[in-house]
């Protein structure tokens, strides 16, 4: 498949496939990158159906992994997602823009693209309630909201750093609007987001949910990837 590496306002990105009038913007998840296996599979399927794919590295991921001056915080990620969208509109003149997002990439997309004209959204193992995840990490690390506000950042024993500005942004920007045709693939053994939260999100925003029994948050086994490939048949 034809691929082209480009740079969008210092964001490393990749265009997959020949020039088309339709595109999927692909937003990867934590500890992933713009060339991840699930994005490769998406690009192959999308190309066969007449779409290009535009993927990019989130802060501190992929080609940006060693840049510690611009952290993978929600504010920065939302800013980057908006820049990618504007670039796609201005430079490629797509007639149709679609979205694929995984894990925390889905959460950033819900914030950045809520007012965008997106034809269809595909979410793999999405994070739809980031506050719940941060609240849990604060509980596990015995960190109170007051302590985090006072110290601004706290490094936990399990390796994650909690940031007050990140938490405050999440609290002040709840997901209240997502009026797009959306399909979600979720593993029943996802340890990042409870199934009830996913189902509540689907009911609230009329999303179509597919569940892989015994599937994990990280789709990586042959069985999981085969199920994922078949799920992508919704791309037409």
Regions found by a protein language model. Give the residues of each.
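N-terminal cap/lid segment of alpha/beta-hydrolase-fold proteins
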Residues: 1-19
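Catalytic nucleophile-loop/oxyanion-hole region of alpha/beta-hydrolase
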Residues: 62-92
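Gly/Ala-rich beta-loop-alpha elbow adjacent to hydrolase catalytic centers
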Residues: 100-109
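The serine-hydrolase catalytic nucleophile loop
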Residues: 31-43, 196
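Conserved alpha/beta-hydrolase
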Residues: 38-39, 43-66
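The alpha/beta-hydrolase serine catalytic core
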Residues: 72, 107, 117-200, 204-211, ...
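Short beta-strand element of the alpha/beta-hydrolase
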Residues: 21-29
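Short beta-to-alpha linker loops that shape the active-site pocket of alpha/beta-hydrolase fold enzymes
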Residues: 30, 57-64, 127, 215
């Amino acid at each position: 498949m034809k691929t082209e590496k480009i740079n969008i306002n210092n964001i490393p990105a990749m265009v997959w496939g020949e020039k088309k009038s339709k595109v999927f913007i692909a937003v990867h998840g934590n500890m992933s990158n713009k060339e991840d296996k699930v994005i490769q599979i998406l690009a192959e399927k999308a190309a066969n159906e007449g779409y290009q794919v535009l993927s990019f590295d989130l802060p501190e991921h992929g080609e940006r992994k060693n840049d510690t001056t611009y952290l993978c915080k929600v504010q920065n990620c939302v800013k980057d997602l908006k820049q990618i969208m504007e670039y796609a509109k201005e430079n490629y003149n797509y007639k149709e823009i679609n979205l694929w997002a995984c894990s925390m990439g889905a959460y950033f997309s819900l914030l950045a693209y809520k007012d965008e004209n997106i034809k269809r959204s595909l979410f793999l193992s999405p994070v739809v309630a980031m506050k719940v995840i941060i609240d849990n990490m604060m509980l596990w690390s015995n960190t109170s909201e007051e302590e985090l506000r006072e110290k601004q950042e706290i490094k936990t024993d399990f390796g994650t750093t909690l940031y007050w500005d990140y938490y405050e942004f999440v609290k002040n920007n709840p997901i209240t609007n997502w009026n797009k045709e959306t399909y979600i693939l979720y593993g029943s053994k996802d340890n990042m987001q409870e199934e009830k939260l996913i189902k509540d999100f689907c009911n609230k925003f009329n999303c179509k949910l597919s569940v892989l029994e015994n599937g994990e948050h990280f789709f990586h086994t042959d069985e999981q990837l085969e199920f994922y490939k078949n799920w992508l048949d919704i791309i037409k």
